[in-house]
Amino acid sequence: GTNFDYLLKITNETKTEYSDLVVYDTLPRSGDKNVFGTQDRSSEFDIHLRRVITPPEGYTVFYTTSAEVYQKSMADMVNADIWMDSVSDYSAVTAFKIVANEGTALNGESTFEVRIPAQAPNQLDDASMAKPHEKTSQDQTSGTATWLEANNSFGFQTNESPTVMESNTVWARIPFA
């Protein structure tokens, strides 16, 4: 498959310091939902991690291979007993969370950034391969190209702002002519 990176970025535009930042992301899968578990993200193929995530200084990454993350919200899963600090097969990871270590804060007027090493599949499953055929008739009339899309957004929260917030959505596309 094709290798690429997601860049997760949180900018604190205020002068307020935020502690206990937790960033939570489920990797795109066909039929996945947003971080609240309430709305389809409409991913049409699966994305996998290709290696360990290198967090910014002062943060620790935890991984899970649990499929439950696709049925439940960040609020339900972020503290569940499913997380480990390493895995033997990064392609099996379904979600990760990045947690601020004790004493680490997102300072005022600063940015948190981390690159997520991802990979599109070498071969699409049957359900994903059926989707371009469904789209073809729509695209033939408009003259546009057909593609499959994997959509990603991440959730985050802090001690000072404990309500889960969701990032903007980004996508990876596989075009078909």
Question: Where do the language-model regions lie?
Answer:
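Enriched for extracellular/lumenal, surface-exposed ectodomains of secreted and cell-surface proteins
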Residues: R29, K135-D139, N151-T163
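Long, low-complexity ectodomains and other extracytoplasmic segments of secretory-pathway proteins
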Residues: N34-V35, V170-A177
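A surface/secretory-pathway sequence property marking extracellular, secreted
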Residues: T26-K97
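Low-complexity, intrinsically disordered segments enriched in Ser/Thr together with acidic residues
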Residues: N3-K9, M74-L148, I174
